[in-house]
Amino acid sequence: IEGRTKSAYYVGAVTNAYRHALDDAIAGRPLDPVWQREVLQISHRPYSTGFYFGQPGQYTANSAYFAGAEVCAVVEGTAPDGRAVLTQRNKFAVGDTLELVTNTAPPVTFTAQDLRDGDGEALETVPHPMQRFTMPLPCTAAPLSLVRRKLPAETVDIRLECGKIKESRT
């Protein structure tokens, strides 16, 4: 993992994807596409084959970052009633489609429901940074597991016009 100021989410997602990909390769299994999709979810600049096919030259068409998902909450633990205790990182609401990201399995998609504050009062949304709350998760999650939301896909059109690379975003 290279670069500066990589978040815990970035390091965890990349390490998890690489670990599973390496385990598959060593076992002689084909690469599960879920792990390639996983590294596309984190904030990143465009990927390349590097020097795999020889000297690549410089890629200067785009230095913008892309992200396929944002972290909404971090799992702190499990309450006595079995609900997950979480800390908010980005606002989300009941009914939002989320993913539980652990280090042991591919992400699990679920719908946010039954959010509760520290007093057990029902919440429709968790709008405050670092707000502690509880909610049921689709499976057991260890502390520091993440809950994330997929972001709308951005379309990037890169083409050659008059000998120069042109890029447009929608």
Tell me what each language-model feature is.
Residues 1:
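Extended, alpha-helix-rich binding/interface surfaces that flank or overlap catalytic cores
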Residues 4-170:
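Surface-exposed amphipathic alpha-helical tracts and adjacent flexible/coil segments at the periphery
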